[in-house]
């Protein structure tokens, strides 16, 4: 139906014209969609309904319900029935999923406290029976991020086969079982033969899907990595791609394009399914999920940049240009413990580099500064258009603080470049003050957002890979030039005062980057000052 909708053109009145032809169209990957598997505030019921309709519109057919903070999905209440109000919501989700040709997959996460007894393994099946009565016909068992007895691969395989034999096969109308293993990425997997992954491969019924995040927790999906795990689990792995999830970088938005996914011959055969773990911001996640839908339907024909921009146009038809400017500069996670980064500010980055290189040498390249100033002006102008025309109140609730900060970054950048170009020291100083005021406004937005009464609070970072660092460096360069001219004395550079055994990377304390930091793991000692 979605293919017909895409082919149809409006005729007069209520009519639609379809071209004459033969449609040959099918997906490269059987199961395509998302896993709500992030740490943080789970999506709201309304957000999930919106997601399911979005999946149907874009040919995704899988939604795996596995929010880490749902106590009835995980410990301590995975054995217990949902309260009546939550059960009613799940029943509605199943209904809407079916209307949109989406499998609602309910996942259980028992591994934190499961007892490997017949009684407790039966408790998993009993919970599935409860969910079956709510209309659920697709199920998953997660053993990720656990310790202790729950990690045993032999017992996990025993439980999964028991569920498969006594529940899935008996019901007749239940889709193949999905499991997320404890060793769900190559970096955490025991490479020795006969260990965890090999046990699953040897003992699990071949119909059971095994999930996999890649060569590490957050990583591109490569054919070589797929082949490595598939040899061990003896089936095509079911990809759980940790993008655009931000539970490890909450200050940033990942609204960039989908790339870094295998597309060479053999790629589609290496995947039994492909789901994305999105952000806790469901509306903002749709930008990247649109690209995932395109990739998983037609891997060889996937064009990353085109899909990204087409997604923005479809999601925000009245604010597409402004939103594209915004997502251009809000796509990277920033430094993080997983070491997974995304490109950001790609088109303007060469200009930024040339401007900074010249400025460090006391030079100005007028052509480049004009281009950079124009981009900062586009950033400042995009924010009010997004507020007025995005036509998505839920989105603005999710990213409103980032849009506000983005506008201030645009103002700060314009003033910083103008200060660099200014020959009059006092005029340059005025521009510099205006730039720092805009940066201070950004800091205020971030602080207020980080103090809001929510469980998972975060700072707000925008343009953090290229544009914000550029403004900070330009402001520093201008200040070193301007203030000595006004004060009649050399400018002083800040230096760290503490010394001792924990000075490694102490230069981050005064590097001018508001996103970096230094901390000492040692107490101050006599003589450290």
Task: For each feature predicted by the language model, list its residue ranges.
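Catalytic-core regions of glycoside hydrolase
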Residues: 12, 37-38, 75-76, 80-81, ...
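Short polar catalytic/cofactor-binding loops
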Residues: 38-41, 185, 501-504
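Short, solvent-exposed loop/turn elements at domain surfaces
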Residues: 41-45, 220, 284, 506-508, ...
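Conserved beta-strand positions in the central sheet of alpha/beta enzyme cores
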Residues: 64, 140-142, 275
């Amino acid at each position: 139906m979605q293919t017909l909708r895409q082919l149809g053109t409006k005729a007069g009145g209520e009519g639609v014209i379809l071209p004459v032809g033969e449609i040959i169209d099918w997906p490269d990957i059987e199961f395509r969609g998302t896993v709500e598997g992030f740490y943080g505030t789970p999506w709201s019921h309304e957000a999930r309904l919106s997601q399911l309709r979005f999946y149907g519109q874009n040919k995704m057919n899988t939604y795996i319900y596995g929010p880490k903070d749902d106590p009835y999905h995980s410990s301590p209440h995975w054995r217990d029935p949902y309260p009546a109000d939550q059960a009613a919501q799940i029943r509605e989700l199943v209904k809407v999923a079916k209307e949109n040709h989406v499998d609602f997959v309910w996942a259980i996460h028992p591994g934190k406290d499961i007892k490997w007894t017949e009684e407790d393994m039966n408790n998993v099946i009993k919970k599935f029976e409860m969910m079956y009565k709510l209309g659920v016909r697709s199920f998953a068992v997660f053993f990720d991020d656990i310790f202790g007895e729950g990690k045993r691969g032999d017992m996990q395989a025993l439980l999964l086969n028991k569920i498969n034999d006594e529940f899935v096969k008996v019901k007749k109308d239940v889709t193949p079982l999905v499991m997320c293993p404890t060793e769900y990425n190559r970096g955490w997997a025991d490479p020795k033969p006969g260990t965890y992954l090999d046990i699953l491969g040897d003992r699990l019924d071949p119909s059971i899907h095994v999930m996999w995040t890649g060569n590490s927790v957050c990583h591109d999906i490569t054919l070589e990595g797929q082949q490595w795990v598939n040899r061990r689990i003896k089936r095509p792995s079911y990809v759980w791609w940790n993008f655009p999830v931000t539970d490890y970088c909450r200050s940033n938005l990942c609204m960039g394009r989908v790339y870094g996914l295998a597309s060479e011959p053999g790629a589609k055969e290496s995947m039994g399914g492909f789901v994305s773990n999105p952000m806790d911001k469901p509306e903002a996640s749709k930008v990247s999920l649109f690209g995932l839908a395109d990739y998983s339907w037609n891997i060889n024909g996937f064009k990353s940049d085109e899909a990204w921009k087409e997604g923005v146009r479809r999601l925000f038809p009245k604010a597409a240009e402004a939103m594209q400017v915004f997502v251009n500069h809000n796509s990277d996670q920033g430094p993080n413990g997983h070491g997974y980064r995304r490109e950001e500010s790609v088109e303007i980055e060469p200009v930024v580099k040339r401007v900074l290189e010249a400025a460090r040498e006391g030079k100005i390249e007028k052509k480049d500064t004009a281009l950079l100033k124009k981009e900062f002006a586009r950033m400042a102008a995009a924010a009010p258009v997004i507020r007025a025309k995005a036509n998505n109140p839920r989105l603005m609730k999710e990213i409103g603080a980032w849009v506000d900060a983005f506008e201030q970054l645009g103002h700060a950048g314009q003033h910083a470049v103008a200060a660099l170009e200014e020959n009059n020291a006092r005029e340059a100083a005025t521009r510099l003050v205006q730039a720092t005021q805009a940066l201070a406004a950004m800091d205020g937005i971030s602080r207020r957002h980080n103090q809001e009464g929510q469980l998972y609070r975060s700072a707000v970072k925008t343009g953090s890979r290229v544009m914000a660092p550029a403004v900070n460096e330009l402001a520093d360069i201008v200040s070193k030039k301007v203030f000595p001219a006004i004060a009649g004395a050399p400018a002083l550079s800040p230096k760290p005062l503490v010394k001792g055994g924990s000075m490694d990377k102490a230069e981050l304390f005064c590097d001018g980057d508001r996103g970096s930091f230094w901390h000492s793991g040692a107490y101050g000692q006599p003589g450290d000052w």
